[in-house]
């Protein structure tokens, strides 16, 4: 978990690269926004994607539980253009390691209870704003004025109310100030050790 622009995706990528190939399934929380196909487009466009009510928590928890029990799942996909779920799904096979990535990955208790290791990526507000501006102006073509208004009116208040408080549930807090190689190595060692112990228990 961690605020928008905190560097979650980078941290996840580094963890995946540090672990054995094909041992990790990454589940993006963004795929589990509510299906709003029953609503008109003008209503869907008003969706606050940074509020907990935007997510179908029960489906996310159900699919994580199924992956943990060795079952494959059909992960939903979401379109920010139509602001609703797409008919296509992504087939996800169970893996030794399952990573849930998202701003509120630690928000829902049912989901937290399925996690063996909870990580929060901590980055200062100014740095997060700069990263969001850089990402959304370059990659998504959003006007700067719109991004600043969105940060002030949506991102910051939602972060302060719903995202930042979930830090209390984290087992590890990573200050994302650049090189976090030692933290990644620590997590790699912990995760691989945990997987080994779980496999030993299953063999008994």
Roles of regions detected by a PLM:
Residues 86-140:
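ATP-dependent NMP and nucleoside kinases share a basic, alpha-helical "lid"
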Residues 63-100, 105-106, 192-199:
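Phosphate-binding/switch loop-helix module in NTP-utilizing enzymes
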Residues 93-94, 134-138, 156-204:
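NTP-dependent small-molecule kinase module
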Residues 25-28, 34-82, 97:
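Conserved nucleotide-sensing/catalytic segment adjacent to the nucleotide-binding pocket
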Residues 2-3:
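P-loop (Walker A) phosphate-binding loop of NTP-binding proteins
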Residues 8:
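Conserved lysine of the Walker
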Residues 16-25:
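Post-Walker A helix-loop "phosphate-sensing" segment adjacent to the P-loop in P-loop NTPases
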Residues 11:
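Hydrophobic positions on the alpha1 helix immediately C-terminal to the Walker A/P-loop
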